[in-house]
């Protein structure tokens, strides 16, 4: 089994992005699965081109995109990606779409194929906070999650794909009072646990567990 794991470069004025820093530190193998690590740009459209090239080269069984969600307390596997680009800030090349569809011929939304409840449980079993998220936002994180699902729908039907958001690092919140953060080693630990759950649930589907939200 082969899992492609991607992490974004820094954006929005930060000099570091915990996504790529954590991805770079993942083991090369988890529960027998080969882990392929890839840095991608925080740029609409170009990020998808980079991931597509890697899918064509590596032919992975799974794709897990990792992104920073500043303000969240724990690791949050994402349930769904929506067909909208709506940038709160410009991307790293200055592009700021305001409410535009990602693909005119794409579905309104795509659900992940990953066992997100098993991922969340595995992260918590590792001693770290985790919960299911039902919105990946409308920036490049949602964009890449949607783009990979679109690729799966149109070109790569055998892959399973999803996204997980991670918190800020402590050094990112020095001037952001009352903002949660997580140590890089813990983020790596949580991602490793999530990837282990993906491998363990291969061919079995997700677990049954209470992970719903009221709002």
Swiss-Prot record:
GO annotations of cellular component type:
cytosol
What Pfam families would the database entry show?
Answer: Peptidase_C15 (PF01470)
Where in or outside the cell is it found?
Cytoplasm
**InterPro entries given in the database record:** Peptidase_C15, Peptidase_C15-like, Peptidase_C15-like_sf, PGP-I_bact-type, PGPEP1_Cys_AS, PGPEP1_Glu_AS
Q: Which superkingdom heads the taxonomic lineage of this protein's source?
A: Bacteria
For this UniProt entry, the molecular function terms from Gene Ontology, in alphabetical order, are:
pyroglutamyl-peptidase activity
Catalytic residues in the record? 78, 141, 165
One example of a Gene Ontology biological process annotation: proteolysis
| Positions of disulphide bridges | none
| Annotated catalysed reactions | Release of an N-terminal pyroglutamyl group from a polypeptide, the second amino acid generally not being Pro
Q: Which Gene3D superfamilies match?
A: Peptidase C15, pyroglutamyl peptidase I-like (3.40.630.20)
Protein keywords: Cytoplasm, Hydrolase, Protease, Thiol protease
Main enzyme class: hydrolase
The main location class comes to cytoplasm
UniProt-listed Enzyme Commission number(s): 3.4.19.3
Q: Which family does it belong to?
A: Belongs to the peptidase C15 family.
Q: Which HAMAP family match?
A: Pyrrolid_peptidase
Q: What does this protein do?
A: Removes 5-oxoproline from various penultimate amino acid residues except L-proline.
What does the annotation say about its assembly with partners?
A: Homotetramer.
Q: What is this protein called?
A: Pyrrolidone-carboxylate peptidase
| Gene name, Swiss-Prot/TrEMBL | pcp
